[in-house]
Amino acid sequence: HLLFFSCLCMDMGALTAFFYGFRDREKVLDILEQTTGGRLIQAYNTIGGVQADIHPEFVKKVKELIKYLRPVLKEYHEIFTGNVIAQQRLKGTGVLTREDAVSFGATGGTGRASGWACDVRKRHPYAMYGKVDFREVLFTEGDCFARYMVRMEEILESLRIIEQLIDNIPEGEYQLKMKP
């Protein structure tokens, strides 16, 4: 979602917001690289687990990132979301009704920006999603601004999910021994 934010800002000429978004995306990539060894392509998940145990600093750094990101997200809204030019360009543009979203199969943030409650994590929870509390972000306007806001609010929901899980990462084997 930080990449989405950054690229949208760049496309709209809001270069300060673009640089802020990429700066903060780098913080996320630094944490991932420390554990997975890759910045953009992690190749970390495997059949039976993951390639390696998490880095000893992982939990600490994730908590620091969450603490850092909350006020930064408010700053994003101050410098971009509230910008009259951004609002004029995004509001009322590219409207997708709920009916069309369902008909076209536009799931994810696009569907939810049109008022379609289609978050698979809520409808058919998998992994740990059934054990965490989070809000399915919905807007009804169906325009570009609603799609933007869904993604921005989903960043906050992602932080809530991570906060609920970060201290509960199980210890022990990180990859099951399996026969080929």
Please identify what each model-predicted range represents.
Residues H1-P180:
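Active-site bordering "gate/hinge" segments
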